């Protein structure tokens, strides 16, 4: 079983602004979000297939607590409430499908994958994908 536990600092980010555009976030809020999320700090606790992930930015802290294969409540990148289900896509990669609880919007998901000493995080909204690469702190 892969060990995601630890503290992670972002090394690079691609397409975050494009992802926010695909989610319908206005230009002013996108600029604020891109600036605030430019240096996120992530802490992951793992006990087998149980995960607790806390992400800190300058404007907010998000927390999710989930077990692989069990639905849980969370929010999309733009703050809409959803039901999520994380499953193993490969031995080192989890895939999480998000289903909005109300309203319409693009199909969203996220993945987290361990590749060597890196944590690869992707967020998707329909066909737009944001990739963020983290290193252990």
Swiss-Prot record:
Pfam families named among the record's database cross-references: Lipocalin
Molecular function in Gene Ontology: retinal binding; retinol binding
Coiled-coil spans in chain: none
Localization in the cell: Cytoplasm
Protein origin, superkingdom: Eukaryota
UniProt GO cellular component terms: cytoplasm
InterPro entries from the UniProt entry: Calycin, Fatty_acid-bd, ILBP, Lipocln_cytosolic_FA-bd_dom
Predominant location category: cytoplasm
Sorted UniProt keywords: Cytoplasm, Retinol-binding, Transport, Vitamin A
Residues that bind all-trans-retinoate: 132-134
Membership in a protein family: Belongs to the calycin superfamily. Fatty-acid binding protein (FABP) family.
Domain free text: Forms a beta-barrel structure that accommodates hydrophobic ligands in its interior.
Protein function: Cytosolic CRABPs may regulate the access of retinoic acid to the nuclear retinoic acid receptors.
Protein name: Cellular retinoic acid-binding protein 1
Lineage: Eukaryota, Metazoa, Chordata, Craniata, Vertebrata
